[in-house]
């Protein structure tokens, strides 16, 4: 292959739109020091501004924990109904993103098992891709999440972030449902 560059041709300035952001697969990876080093390098050397990843609500992020998730307590009456909502692991991830000089591009996914209508998982890391069993409960969960972000990072900071409802709901490996199901999920999330 030969490449010819006409150095006398008219040029146009680059708009650097590619520097807007980069994807990083799974949120939990941002707990790793080596991943943070790579993301900081991407920011410092390439100018990326936002970082987007999947799975901030995956079970390994411990956002919703039920007493029944712990084997010794499964026999306790109503153990599935006793739960805690906690965004500490998500906060650690976002703290790391901000420490790298970037801002989060928040993908509101996937479904915590405690809120899920089923057990269908997507690719690799057991992300639950089902819809919530209760849209009202999901909406309440999202409201708690947004309030947590506002308390921790402040309104001005959070307003500088981008938010996305789910990841590629048109692909069966990421969302179990039809287009109308996604529209209902979106409406319940964006309230």
What feature does the model see in each segment?
Residues 169-173:
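Aromatic- and kink-enriched transmembrane "portal" helix at the membrane-lumen/periplasm boundary
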Residues 1-162, 180-191:
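Non-catalytic accessory regions flanking glycosidase/transglycosidase catalytic cores in CAZymes
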């Amino acid at each position: 292959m030969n490449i010819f560059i006409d150095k006398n041709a008219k040029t146009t300035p680059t708009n650097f739109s590619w520097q807007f952001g980069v994807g990083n697969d799974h949120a939990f990876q941002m707990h790793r020091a080596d991943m943070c080093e790579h993301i900081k390098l991407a920011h410092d050397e390439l100018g990326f501004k936002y970082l987007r990843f999947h799975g901030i609500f995956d079970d390994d992020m411990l956002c919703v924990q039920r007493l029944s998730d712990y084997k010794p307590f499964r026999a306790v009456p109503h153990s599935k109904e006793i739960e805690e909502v906690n965004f500490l692991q998500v906060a650690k991830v976002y703290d790391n993103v901000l420490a790298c000089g970037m801002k989060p591009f928040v993908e509101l996914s996937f479904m915590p098992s405690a809120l899920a209508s089923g057990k269908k998982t997507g690719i690799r890391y057991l992300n639950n891709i089902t819809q919530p069993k209760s849209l009202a409960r999901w909406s309440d969960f999202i409201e708690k999440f947004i309030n947590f972000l506002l308390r921790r990072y402040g309104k001005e900071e959070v307003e500088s972030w981008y938010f996305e409802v789910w990841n590629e709901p048109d692909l069966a490996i990421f969302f179990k449902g039809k287009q109308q199901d996604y529209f209902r999920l979106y409406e319940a999330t964006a309230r």
